[in-house]
Amino acid sequence: WNALGSARPARAIVAGYEVSCRIGVAVQPSHYRYWHTTGTVGTFGAATATALLLGCDAERTAHAVATAATFAGGLQQAFRSSGMSKPLHPGHAADAGALAAIGAAAGVTGALDALHGPVGFAAATSEDTGKWDKALAGLGERFAITAMTFKNHGCCGHIFAGLDAVAALRAEHGFGPDDVEAVHLGGYGPTKEVCDRPDPGTEQEARFSAQYCVAALLVLGGVRLAAFEPAALADPRIRALSRRVAVSLDPELAADYPGRRAAKVAVKLRDGREVSRHQRTRKGDPDAPLSDGELAEKFTELAAPVVGAPAARALLDSLRHGDALPGLLPLTARAPPRRAAPSRKARPRRRPSRRAPTAW
């Protein structure tokens, strides 16, 4: 791996992204009703990329994708709990896809009609056996990776447009958290269905709470890693402000989804003013991309706690300007370890209750 040039991995990444996105087109939008596309179609991308890195020919790569079809998984129910399984979906997709490719490279075969067959992936996870004509349109002429989104906030993407609207209104009108009487966020279907959580009790729930994230943006200035640390989750200013944030379904925005992921935000200020914004795109989307500096800032924020700041800077420089991959990195933590999940033994035993636990 240390001698691997940059062209082959780049080709593998582009191909993996292309395969997963086109399979996603074939099964959407009905697939998203029960399935999380990152965990499902992401598996096909990982299988394709790994197969190409391993030097598989077209037949072996096809078997990698076929085997990935039976490995793919990731349920929408994971979004609707305080559990940690949802963030595991991308890791599982990468692991399962890589395993499928390693097996294919060694001669393991899959059902080559696993995607489109009558009881295959599309039939099992969407409303039909797949919109393959639509999925294959423009193949080789346009590439999905050129229209990718970089996440600019550390929470659910269905909240992004609302957060961008609040940030723009704050910059334009100069108000702070203490000036806000109420916030109303109108969104499309998943914004309401997945992210209308007025009383989140855990880090995972907070990442899917539009109310919490809007309040955290106003109080902390951003919604990145620090917004989900224990101190932020217990911050009385965020708690109080989040109770004044309402979320509703906007029919116009719902009709435009998934082609457009927008938000309409109205902020009522204590001085009597009401300011509003229709946020038609999200920062980080193809039509509003992050700058190179913003991407570097995000990379460093995520990488430095794992490999250390000097190594993160060197790695970024190598990825930007080098003609070969930097090789395997020792993932030695340079920062204090993240808190462990509370031990079950430390909790007093309580009778089961049908009520959800209180948030704070």
What does each model-identified segment do?
Residues 3-99, 106, 111-119, 124:
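Glycine-rich, mobile lid/loop segments that gate access to catalytic sites or pores
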Residues 85-95, 102-360:
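Terminal-appendage/accessory-domain detector
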